[in-house]
């Protein structure tokens, strides 16, 4: 296992260990007791540093999307009900990530949910915090380093400006990792959504499969990607 793979595995285990804390809006990190600067002074300091910088490295994470209305991942919010309501009503989970961990009875239901999840982020408009950030970066040399997989940054910037270090919802990969190739997920997701209609299942023939080994695909993401196959797989005992 490479150093990077080891780091990813440890990060995922730590995230899983503290999932309930994060889901409730808390943190497992011991926060500093040092009093922050008054808010206006923080803004002034931020502006000064942006103006003086020759190049800016932007670290963008899930808070940007959540602040712009993409707050459906962890709890039963209005946006979760808007996009995932039929699944929440039928299966009882609350929060989009809980749906990713749900043990659906069939692969058809499983992929109905995965398609809905990916369709939600693939087709979301550019959220306001990203537009605010873009205004801040005007005229500056910059690069984006993001853990987000929801395609918001690549909707507003050229791909060479963005490093998506945890994957991208526009692509699939082989669930068995038979090779490193990735495939388009946008059209397959659109086809599954159209076929599913108001239901929660997709037909067998639309379940995406690796053209090399025939295994099911899963989204090209770090973390819950493996759980889509191994955790959500129906119980066989």
Set out the residue ranges of the language-model regions.
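Conserved catalytic core of sirtuin-type NAD+-dependent deacylases
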Residues: 2-236
